[in-house]
Design a protein with these regions (language model features):
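Extreme N-terminal tail/first-helix region
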Residues: 1-18, 134-135, 141
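Hydrophobic small-molecule pocket/channel-lining residues, especially in calycin-type beta-barrels
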Residues: 9, 22, 83-84
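Short, conserved, surface-exposed binding loops centered on an aromatic residue
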Residues: 14-16, 37-39, 57-59
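Short beta-strand segments
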Residues: 19-51, 67
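Short beta-strand segments in beta-sandwich/barrel cores
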Residues: 22, 45, 92-93, 121-123
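A short, sequence-level motif marking secondary-structure junctions
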Residues: 37-41, 91-94, 130
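Short, structured beta-strand-loop surface elements
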Residues: 52-111, 118
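C-terminal edge-of-domain segments
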Residues: 98-150
Length: 150
């Protein structure tokens, strides 16, 4: 049984524009992933990375990455919006001309702007109503933590 429905292209673009963070995972002998903000412009994901650390060591060896964006029911009022996610695979490439993306000549100290050259992308949303995966024994859906009405 499938729990997800593929997003239309319009839904995918709206999802990418509505969110600003995800998890960037690097290829390698051992797993390495970190939370990372992004900007979606001109059918491209843009990421700004510091020029040092483990991610740069990984990137020098292999530019292939996977970026996952997820919005869960827990993040919405009354658990009403379906869980939605996008998984994007490709290679990170340094952006030489930032003006192409309307970013001007901004320069961040010890940081480089990268674009994710998308090789493959998939996006789905949950079709369960309400989310049966988080229902308690009585069948009632568990309320979102930290959310107060009114």
């Amino acid at each position: 049984m499938s729990y997800g429905k593929k997003l239309t292209n319009a839904e995918l673009i709206a999802f990418l524009n509505a969110n600003r963070h995800g998890i960037l995972a690097f290829a390698g002998r051992t797993p390495y992933a970190l939370p990372m903000g992004y900007i979606y412009r001109e059918k491209t994901l843009l990421l700004c990375l510091t020029d040092e650390g483990k991610k740069m060591e990984r990137l020098k060896k292999n530019k292939t990455v996977c970026y996952t964006i997820c919005k869960t029911r827990w993040e919405t009022e009354g658990l009403k919006t379906p869980c939605t996610s996008a998984v994007i695979e490709g290679k990170l490439e340094a952006v030489k001309d930032k003006s192409v993306y309307g970013l001007g000549a901004k320069k961040f100290e010890n940081m480089t702007l990268y674009k994710l050259a998308i090789a493959e992308m998939g996006a789905r949303k949950c079709i369960r109503k309400p989310c049966e995966l988080f229902a308690n024994k009585s069948g009632a859906t568990v309320k979102a933590r930290g959310k107060k009405k009114g």
